[in-house]
Every structure is written in structure tokens, then in C-alpha cells.
Regions:
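The catalytic-center signature of Zn2+-dependent metalloproteases
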Residues: 343-364, 369, 478-534
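Sec/Tat signal peptide C-region and signal peptidase I cleavage site
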Residues: 19-23
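Bacterial N-terminal signal peptides that target proteins for export
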Residues: 1-9
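Sec-exported extracytoplasmic/periplasmic mature domains
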Residues: 324-335, 365, 490, 494, ...
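Stable alpha-helical elements in mature extracytoplasmic
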Residues: 315-322, 476, 480, 484, ...
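Auxiliary tRNA-acceptor-end handling modules of aminoacyl-tRNA synthetases
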Residues: 24-68, 73-311, 329, 333, ...
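Bacterial N-terminal signal peptides
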Residues: 9-18
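Conserved catalytic/binding loops enriched for acidic/polar residues
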Residues: 470-475, 500-894
Length: 894
């Protein structure tokens, strides 16, 4: 929080001016020799705590009905501690799920007179204590006061203070109401009359408190909270965890942008001789060698994960196997037995809420939005990971084994095929406060369920798996191991690596010996797709089998001891490891390199495999279309008896994944290869290299043939008549009213076609093309791009009459042509911010050319009614756009 003291000066002078000119100085108050009990400003300690239940621990807590007294010892005043707030029990839908984090801060208690302030410590800025720059910081930057608590009692002998924390806990101090507004689409109000304190637990290093909050929506029209018995009263249990910070901070390791770690950042204004005031520390566990002189040593304290009793028996050995598969990476950092998996003790000595234990647990939700989540407790001063508790959604693996996608809305299909659209929308609504949470989001459920659905279909089409059967354990086991390794990787500090799939040469994908050594992808932090061989006689590993080349390198960067006595020496040590970033298998990119609309690198994707994403897109789309066009599709997926709605969901799964694969081609258009490279490192390359013009043309040709062509999504009429809708009508199922009974393949195809067309005309993409024109004579130019798009979408119009057959026979082609005309028209009349001026001119030119094509074709006397009506309508749209564009451009200045 910034406190701008310059704003206080006028108010101070105004106050002084209002004082009497000859005001007398106040006389000192007399001090009595001894205060009687009745003179004490606070209640007596024993009397205040009468009938309370004491829970001894980090902060001693005393519980009495609606009061929750916290004892603050003198040493605990101005002692920073971690506060992590999470949703202990949600409603199982709308993203309001148990286990999800809400807020984390560093807090401290400060006494001011008869009150104790609950203060959020500003950890963003730091300076060496006692220096002039430290004094300057104190004048400019302060802390935030979250609450002022009346002192209820003070112990005579220890001077410990009692405050009632209940009013803080049973409140909206974390701004949860705003988050619920975003989740539900309705504003909500905390109903204090229906809210209360929940359970409380205490441990030596942490205090755990809960509040049972009830929220009342302002308007229930259209509100969907079917998992709540009474939608007027929405219950959310909020969990507060206060924990101790290490007395001796860990020596931090500075981050390097070439290796993917979560980090904590602080500004140190004393670093005026450095290139930045920022200090960035990676998140890592405190691993110290028991024998510092040994090349390989056991740690003083290993990283231990306890597998909780909530994990089903069958999964426990797989979970422990996955945890300990990280050991090979730590061996590369000089540690043996650095990471250990244990079954959670079954006695009262163990509690997963005790910060001394890191756990893996299973949870269940009515409508899960994540497959797993791995929140960690971080010391913001150093980046030290103090504790981690991984939650797996039980239905994720059920989805992997049994379920296909159910697509109910155009937005769901569009964002499923082009995930960056959803991420962009979420980022747009993310405040600065929760932006860090956006970089840490993990959509593991989507990766796992879609992968399982496709693998199951493949095995059924092979005849390996009987129709209607779930994916068997021999295929589920490696998927579970990957998923657990992925989530454990997050709690070791690692971010996603969406470049790792391109580290494997495509010809090596089915080479089991190669993929066992290097990984099917170089990092388990990837979102992979099953490695399905299109030559079914030569099938390799479906899933990677352990830590990959990147994982081993990243762990070495983060955890290998440097033995350095000074921070600069440790930086030099870590930099030498990071300098290996251009070696094969060390490629790295993460969420912000992959999801944004202006993310330019076609190699940074999710759900791809191999070093040629465009080649992958070609092969995967051919394979998916082959599946739904196979005459055996129904019999192999459903069998002779069974639920035909499963066939519809299977078709939805294939169409969605077709869109995911095809969408990778869009990134080649106006794309650039981005390398995280530092000056002078071995093998140094240019950090930004435009994609070759020939490759961009190849990508557009692919989109033209496999997305925008009239027959791109063709399926047999017989199959479409067999795709049965669901006929259930109760809570937890889609509302059947207003839902089409037939399978709208046309609409689904148009959603994907239009999304990729819009992405191909995005301002950032066109701007990059324009910039590339000045860098190379052999560039893919904006003018060529528009011309090729027009030919791809309107090529049959204006030519030979025999080419018009697709236009007359199906509305799909006519619809995407209208979308293209509308996109060009919008570029003239209401261009998106950032659209290059050249693009507006070229849009006008292409509209004129489309008008000419339509005019020539309308002279053909044998045109069908559909085609003639379509061309006349297109000309009318073009005319309106050109006239409106002229009016906009010639409008006088005001």
C-alpha cells in the first residue's frame, strides 16, 4: 500500500490554522501510586476467560460461544506471520469449491493504546535496516490496517493481550463477496444472522480457524446454484490459517527467466547500482546437505509428502510412485532420498492441517472446475516453501476412464478449442491482487479427461477395449503417475512448461527407448495429449514415464547447493546452470507465452506432441475425422446395447479436439519463434525470429482445407441421426428447454470456423506481420494475407460455375463467407484497438473484390436460389460497409 504523505500536508496546515492562537500546552496527567482492580481499563484475565475452551498452539486461542479470544504475547506483537485464507467448503459448482485459495498475506498485530491493529505487512518493498534509504522508504510506503480490535484483557504477569477475533473472522475481510459476484453473476450480501464461527485447531507452528458464512444473493433470477438446498442462503466455509515464519530465513536463490519457477518479487531501493531494484526469489524447499563436502548426500530434512486416508486404496501406490519418481531429478542436484512418500499415520498425532506435514488428499465436487490444485505456503522474504497440500478432484480420474465431453454452449466449444480465449477472459476480470493466482492456475482436469476420452475411443476402435468399457488400469496407471508428478512439480516450485512437447523429434515419438530416457515430453509440467500412433502397429508410450530432461535441469538450477558464502556467488553459480537453456530438452515457455491473444510462438501450445506443431495438427485432425467417419464408430463406442447419449458426447469430444489441433495453425500466421536467451550464453540465438513466409502460407492452406472448406466437418447423415440428446430433467443436468434435439454439427463447425477466422485477423497478428515486412524481403505480408484469406473463403465465387456446387449444397460455406464479410466490414467501421491502418485499407479492397466476384457470378443464369440469394445479400452487406466506412473516415473533426 502506498501512502502519499504529500496529500497529508495541506490537511495538517489546515488543522494548525484552526487551532486557537494562544492555546495552552496540555498539563501532564497525574499518575496514581497504584491502580485498583476497578481502575483497570480491561476485564480481568480469569474472568474474561471463564468458561472458555483453551486451544494451545501458535497463537493460544480461547473459545466461548460467539467469542474467539486470541492471546497475543509481547513477543508476538509486530511479529510477521503468514495468513492463508481458503474455501474449506464451497457449494460444489460455479468455481466455489472446497480447497480453493482465497487470499494470502503477511500480517502482524500492533498495539495502539487500548486496541490491537491487525496489519497487512507490505512485503513488496525492502531496504537494509538502519540505512538512510530505509528511513526514506518508511516516509513513503506503509502497511494496511485491516481491523482494529479492542483489547479485552491484559495479563498482569506476562502482559499478554486478549482480543476477540470473531468479528474479523465472521466478516468479508477477504472481499469474498466480490469473488462470489464474479462467480455467480449476482451480487451477494453477507448474512451475519446466519453466520457463525466454525471449528478451530491449534498446532505448534500454526493456528487454524474457520467461519461458517451465509451469503444472500441480491437477485435470484437466473441464478443456478442447484447444489445448494435453498438458493436464498448460500453457505461458504472460510478457513483461516495463521502460521509462523522461520526464525532464520533461508538463503534465497535468485530467479532466472530461462528456467520456470514460481517466484516472490521485492523492490530493494538500495540496489541503485544494479540493473533493477527488483529482487526475484524462486520458490523452493530448504534442502541442505547433511554432508556438504559430498557430491551426493542425504538432506538434513527431506521433502516428505503424506498420502492421506482420503486417497482410494488402489491409487495410493501409484501416488507414492509418482512422488518418488522426482528423486532422479534431485540426484542430479546432489541429493539422495531428497523426496519421500509416506502413508499418513492413522492415529491422532497426524493432522493434514498441521503445517509440519505436506499432504496429498482427494476431494469431491458436484461440478468440479479443476482436477488438482497444489497450494503452497511460501515465506515471502526468501521464497522458501514451508508446506504444501495437494488436492485431487476424485471425479478427474472417473472422467478419464468413462466420460466424453458434453458441449452445451457455443462459448464452451470455442474456448475448449482455443483455450486462450477463456484465459484471456479470466485475465480481463483478474485484479492486480489475484493476478498472481492466474499465473498459478492449473487446468489439469481438462487435460486428463480429454486425454482419457480420446485414448478410450482409440482402444475401442482398435478392438482392444470392449464397447462401453472404461479405460483399464494398465492405461490409467501411467496417467495418474503423470498427473501426480505434475502437481507435485508445482509444489516443488515449478511452473508449466508448454514448450516441452516440442523437444521430442516427431520420428522419435514411438521409440520407447528414446522416450524412456528423455521423456515423451521433456517435462511433466506440460499439458500433454496421449501419444497415439496413427500406425496402430507401431505404438509407443501413451504417457511419459518420469521426470524429463527439462525437469532434471530445472531441479538442478533450483536445488543444487552452490556452497557460496555471498549472494553474488550463488547468482553466478545458478546463472551457469541457466546458461544451458539452449541445449536440447531445455526449451521452456509457460502460461503467459501460450494463452494470450498476442502470444506469437507457434511452438508454445497445450495438447500437442512433437517438434512440428503444424505437422501434429495435420496428423491429429486427419485421425479425428477418420474416427467419426468410420462406419464402425457407433458399434465400437456404444456396442449393441447402451446409452446413445454417449455417442453424442463422443462426437462432441472429437469435434472439440479437432478444433484444438487445427487451432495450432493460427499461431503460425504472423508468428515468431521466441527464445529465452541471454547475451553471451553458449549457442546464443536471436530472441525473436519471424516464422518463415513459406511456413505461414502452409498454415493458411491447412486452415483453408481442414477448417473453412465446405466438407471439413462432414459426417454421415446416418451417424448424425444416431446422436441422441439427453432426456433427463432434474438438478445437476442441463436445462432441456430451448435445447435442440438434433445434433447441430453445422453450428458447431461454424463456431470453430469463425473463431479461427477472427483469430487470423487479430490486431496483434496483423501488427506483427506489418513489422516483419520491414525486416525481410521474403516476409509474409499483410496484403498477401488478406488476399489469401479471400481466395480461401470466396475462391469459388467469380470463377467457373461448376465450382459453385458446395455453395449451393450446404449452408456451412455460406455462413463462414458471411462471417468473413462482417469481419472486414467491422475492420472498416469499428476496428478493434491496435488494428493497423493498412489493414483497414486492405479490408476495403477485399470487400470491393468480393463484390466484384459476386457481380460476375450473378450473371450465371443457372444459379440456384440459395446461391443467388446469398450473393445478393453479400453485395448488400458490402455496400453498407463501404458507405458506412466512407462516412466514418470523412467525418469532420470536433
Amino acid at each position: 500500500m502506498f501512502i502519499r504523505h504529500t496529500f497529508l500536508v495541506p490537511a495538517l496546515f489546515a488543522l494548525l490554522a484552526a487551532m486557537p492562537a494562544h492555546a495552552e500546552a496540555p498539563k501532564p496527567a497525574s499518575t496514581p501510586a497504584a491502580a485498583t482492580a476497578s481502575d483497570k481499563p480491561y476485564g480481568e484475565w480469569k474472568k474474561t476467560l471463564k468458561e472458555t475452551e483453551k486451544l494451545a498452539g501458535f497463537f493460544n486461542v480461547y473459545r466461548k460461544r460467539e467469542n474467539l479470544y486470541v492471546e497475543i504475547k509481547p513477543a508476538q506483537l509486530k511479529m510477521p506471520f503468514l495468513s492463508i485464507v481458503s474455501c474449506a467448503r464451497g457449494i460444489g459448482q460455479n468455481g466455489l469449491l472446497g480447497g480453493l485459495p482465497i487470499d494470502d498475506r503477511t500480517l502482524q498485530f500492533e498495539r495502539v493504546g487500548d486496541h490491537v491493529l491487525l496489519v497487512q505487512v507490505n512485503e513488496r518493498f525492502t531496504t537494509p535496516k538502519g540505512t538512510p534509504i530505509d528511513a526514506a522508504r518508511d516516509l513513503s510506503i506503509g502497511n494496511s490496517v485491516l481491523a482494529s480490535l479492542k483489547i479485552e484483557s491484559e495479563q498482569d504477569s506476562t502482559h499478554a493481550l486478549l482480543v476477540d477475533l470473531a468479528p474479523v473472522l465472521v466478516s468479508d475481510i477477504t472481499d469474498l463477496g466480490e469473488a462470489m459476484h464474479a462467480a455467480l453473476g449476482k451480487s451477494v450480501r453477507l448474512d451475519n444472522s446466519r453466520s457463525a464461527l466454525g471449528k478451530a485447531k491449534n498446532f505448534p507452528d500454526n493456528t487454524e480457524l474457520e467461519a461458517l458464512l451465509t451469503w444472500t444473493p441480491s437477485d435470484r433470477t437466473g441464478l443456478d446454484v442447484s447444489a445448494v438446498p435453498d438458493e436464498r442462503f448460500i453457505p461458504i466455509t472460510v478457513h483461516y490459517s495463521f502460521s509462523k515464519l522461520p526464525e532464520v530465513p533461508m538463503a534465497p536463490r535468485y530467479a532466472d527467466d530461462r528456467v520456470g519457477y514460481f517466484l516472490s518479487a521485492q523492490k530493494d531501493f538500495s540496489r541503485d547500482e544494479k540493473d533493477s531494484f527488483f529482487m526475484r526469489y524462486i520458490h523452493r524447499w530448504r534442502l541442505e546437505k547433511r554432508d556438504p563436502s559430498a557430491a551426493m548426500s542425504e538432506p538434513v530434512k527431506p521433502i516428505v509428502y503424506y498420502v492421506d486416508k482420503t486417497v482410494p486404496e488402489k491409487f495410493r501406490p501409484w501416488v507414492k510412485e509418482a512422488i518418488e519418481k522426482w528423486q532422479v531429478a534431485f540426484e542430479g542436484a546432489g541429493f539422495k532420498n531428497a523426496i519421500i512418500a509416506k502413508d499418513a499415520p492413522g492415529d491422532s498425532t497426524f493432522d493434514p492441517e498441521d503445517v509440519r506435514y505436506s499432504t496429498i488428499r482427494w476431494i469431491t465436487s458436484s461440478e468440479p472446475v479443476f482436477g488438482a490444485i497444489g497450494p503452497s505456503r511460501i515465506d515471502p522474504r526468501t521464497g522458501e516453501i514451508l508446506d504444501a497440500d495437494i488436492l485431487f478432484e476424485a471425479s478427474m480420474f472417473q472422467s478419464y476412464r468413462n466420460l466424453y465431453r458434453r458441449i452445451t454452449t457455443a462459448q464452451e466449444l470455442e474456448e475448449g478449442a482455443l483455450p486462450q480465449l477463456k484465459i484471456q477472459r479470466d485475465w480481463a476480470h483478474a485484479s492486480e491482487r489475484n493476478a498472481a493466482g492466474m499465473t498459478a492456475r492449473c487446468d489439469l482436469a481438462t487435460a486428463a479427461s480429454d486425454a482419457g476420452a480420446l485414448l478410450g475411443m482409440t482402444l475401442k476402435m482398435d478392438g482392444t477395449l470392449p464397447p462401453g468399457s472404461p479405460v483399464p488400469d494398465e492405461y490409467l496407471h501411467p496417467a495418474v503417475v503423470w498427473a501426480v508428478m505434475h502437481e507435485v512439480g508445482h509444489t516443488l516450485g515449478l511452473r508449466h512448461n508448454f514448450r516441452s512437447s516440442t523437444s521430442t523429434p516427431a520420428p522419435k515419438l514411438q521409440d520407447v527407448a528414446w522416450t524412456t530416457e528423455h521423456g515423451l515430453y521433456s517435462s511433466v509440467m506440460e499439458y500433454p495429449t496421449p501419444n497415439i500412433s496413427y500406425d496402430r502397429a507401431k505404438q509407443g508410450q501413451y504417457w511419459t514415464s518420469g521426470a524429463g530432461t527439462y525437469d532434471k535441469w530445472a531441479i538442478r538450477f533450483g536445488y543444487a547447493p552452490s556452497g557460496a558464502a555471498a549472494a553474488d556467488q550463488d547468482v553466478a553459480f545458478a546463472t551457469r546452470i541457466a546458461d544451458e537453456s539452449l541445449q536440447p530438452g531445455h526449451e521452456y515457455s509457460t502460461d503467459e507465452d501460450t494463452y494470450p491473444a498476442d502470444a506469437p510462438d507457434p511452438r508454445s501450445n497445450i495438447f500437442d506432441l512433437g517438434d512440428d506443431p503444424l505437422g501434429y495438427a495435420k496428423g491429429r485432425t486427419d485421425y479425428l475425422a477418420k474416427l467419426w467417419r468410420d462406419d464402425r464408430f457407433e458399434s465400437r463406442v456404444v456396442g449393441d446395447t447402451g446409452d446413445l447419449t454417449a455417442l453424442k458426447r463422443a462426437m462432441d469430444t472429437l469435434v472439440l479436439q479437432y478444433g484444438q489441433a487445427a487451432g495450432m495453425a493460427v499461431k503460425y500466421l504472423g508468428g515468431s519463434y521466441i527464445s529465452r536467451v541471454h547475451k553471451g550464453q553458449p549457442g546464443e540465438v536471436d530472441p525473436v525470429v519471424p516464422v518463415a513466409a513459406a511456413r505461414q502460407r502452409e498454415a493458411l492452406d491447412f486452415l483453408s482445407q481442414k477448417v473453412w472448406a465446405a466438407d471439413a466437418f462432414n459426417a454421415s447423415p446416418k451417424l448424425l441421426q444416431r446422436l441422441s440428446p439427453e432426456h433427463w430433467s432434474h438438478w445437476g443436468t442441463p436445462n432441456p428447454f430451448g435445447v435442440r434435439a438434433d445434433y447441430a454439427l453445422h453450428d458447431r463447425a461454424l463456431v470453430l470456423q469463425a473463431a479461427m477466422l477472427r483469430a487470423s485477423l487479430a490486431p496483434a497478428l496483423l501488427t506483427r506481420m506489418r513489422e516483419a515486412e520491414s525486416r525481410s524481403a521474403d516476409s509474409y505480408r499483410v496484403a498477401e494475407h488478406f488476399d489469401r484469406l479471400t481466395k480461401a473463403l470466396w475462391g469459388e465465387v467469380g470463377g467457373l460455375p461448376t465450382a459453385l456446387k458446395p455453395l449451393e449444397g450446404t449452408s456451412t460455406r455460406r455462413e463462414i463467407q458471411r462471417v468473413y464479410v462482417d469481419q472486414l466490414a467491422n475492420m472498416i467501421t469499428s476496428p478493434m484497438p491496435g488494428t493497423p491502418d493498412d489493414a483497414r485499407g486492405l479490408a476495403r479492397l477485399q470487400l470491393q473484390r468480393i463484390d466484384g466476384r459476386c457481380a460476375r457470378t450473378l450473371l450465371v443464369p443457372t444459379l440456384g436460389d440459395n446461391t443467388r440469394a446469398h450473393l445478393l445479400e453479400a453485395r448488400a452487406r458490402v455496400k453498407r460497409a463501404l458507405e458506412a466506412g466512407s462516412q466514418v473516415e470523412t467525418a469532420p473533426l470536433r
